[in-house]
From Swiss-Prot:
It comes from the Bacteria. This is Uncharacterized protein Mb0903c. Keywords: Cell membrane, Membrane, Transmembrane, Transmembrane helix. Its main location: membrane. It holds the Pfam family DUF2530.
């Protein structure tokens, strides 16, 4: 069964609200922060401490790499990650 090019439809673009990354980063960081505070305040959750600290550190590392790549894309570096046009300021 062959499908001709004229019959293939492109999927619709995602709504802009689903392309925003900063709310996802904020919610994830807040969730790890709440879990870390709970792990250090509630004695029964002491076994969570290493996991929550690792979660905070991993989130911080990932956010740092994203911001670094965003800065590289803004200045037009050749090695910058592709596809960050959504986050660049129109100048």
């Amino acid at each position: 069964m062959s499908v001709e090019n004229s019959q293939i439809r492109e999927p619709p673009p995602l709504p802009p609200v689903l392309l925003e990354v900063w709310p996802v980063i904020a919610v994830g960081a807040l969730a790890w922060l709440v879990a870390a505070v709970a792990a250090f305040v509630v004695p029964g959750l002491a076994s969570w401490r290493p996991v929550t600290v690792a979660g905070l550190a991993t989130g911080l590392l990932g956010t740092t790499i994203f911001v670094w790549q965003l800065a590289a894309a803004r200045r037009g570096a050749r090695g910058a990650q592709a596809g960050l046009e959504t986050y660049l300021d129109p100048k």
